[in-house]
């Protein structure tokens, strides 16, 4: 009788150990799957949730509104990517890409509309097609909200400074 009880306890212990390890492996697979889902398209999908949020100077709060760098900073922060909070700070980060290299999720950097010596605007490419790409950004212009614009419009193509990749390789 004692040996049956010992065998039963041993069986339960072994069975529960295998079950725990199986669950741990499933959790690891699940977590690695989540990590692979953070890609360029998911960044744009997340950014588009904020379309029509009003423009608000010096803000990175979706409840109050965004300015351009606040919007870019907020979107990438969700994916644990730290970026400058000021559009001017983008002048010295990243290596400029040629239009053929533009990808969804890259950041477009623009001169100010009054001054071609300083950086005044940033946005995120949401449709990559070289200088005909489209980008999502917080616009202080007529629209005064998060919107999608064409890079090849006169307003933006004339102010274009560079395109950079900020995503890990």
Q: How does the language model describe each region?
A:
Residues 42, 46-50, 74-78, 121:
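A generic structural signal for ordered secondary structure
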């Amino acid at each position: 009788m004692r040996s049956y009880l010992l065998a039963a306890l041993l069986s339960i212990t072994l069975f529960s150990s295998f079950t725990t390890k199986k669950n741990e492996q499933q959790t690891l697979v699940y977590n690695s799957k989540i990590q692979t889902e953070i890609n360029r398209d998911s960044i744009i999908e997340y950014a588009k949730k904020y379309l029509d949020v009003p423009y608000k100077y010096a803000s990175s709060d979706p409840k109050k509104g965004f300015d351009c760098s606040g919007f870019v900073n907020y979107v990438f922060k969700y994916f644990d990517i730290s970026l400058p909070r000021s559009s001017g700070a983008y002048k010295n980060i990243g290596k400029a890409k040629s239009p053929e290299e533009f990808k969804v999720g890259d950041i477009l950097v623009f001169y100010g509309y009054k001054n071609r010596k300083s950086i005044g605007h940033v946005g995120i490419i949401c449709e990559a097609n070289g200088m005909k790409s489209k980008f999502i950004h917080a616009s202080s212009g007529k629209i005064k909200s998060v919107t999608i614009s064409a890079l090849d419009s006169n307003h933006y193509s004339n102010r274009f400074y560079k395109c950079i990749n900020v995503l890990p390789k």
